């Protein structure tokens, strides 16, 4: 079942960008994992968060490479790795899957050699497809939840997720606190997808008459600043550091159209958001 569904995705005539195709394949695998998680008596208590949550439950218009969950119960990542592999084995009859738990016990890597099976990219050696599931223990009591139904491929799944106000606060926190490495040594102060997602939140907020606002109590508890005014200043300073070419490079594998992404960056360059956080 999995192999046939992945082949349909790869064979779509409009799919030309290899990195975008890879992330479409990852999304299909994510669908199976989400079906497993929220039909399991223990793991259904995981709180869905991150970019995939924004896409599946709230309509974010980009792909997401990973699955992110928070937990507030006695969660065993080793048990998760074992049970998700057994799910692929028994329920999906796919025996070539393997799992690995990271050394810090916060991530499960799920590996499937699908491109090798389908002989994709004959001009080079196909790589395995990895989907990572990241798990974090809740560190703030300031949050709201939303129980909702998502469409995950052919599955309809009821998920426990953060509400938009909480996810808005999470995204601002990620934008302010997250750095990553371009190549081996060059450290960048932002991820392009965080910039893109903040813009998306602002569009949703605008359409709601600015009734959608980040959960300020959560922001203050996560960032440990003295006031919202200080957080606003931090956001403005970091936005000034954003280089559009790095946003383009990071987000391009996650959207279908490079032309659309260029249009987004033109708009971004014109106003650099204005006020990101509303009183």
PLM segments and residue spans:
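Anion-coordinating catalytic cores for phosphoryl-, nucleotidyl-, and glycosidic chemistry
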Residues: 64
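Structural signature of FAD isoalloxazine-binding scaffolds in flavoprotein oxidoreductases
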Residues: 69
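Structured mid-to-C-terminal alpha-helical surface segments
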Residues: 1-46, 57-60, 72-73, 77-279
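Glycine-rich beta-strand-to-loop/alpha-helix junction loops that act as flexible
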Residues: 49-52
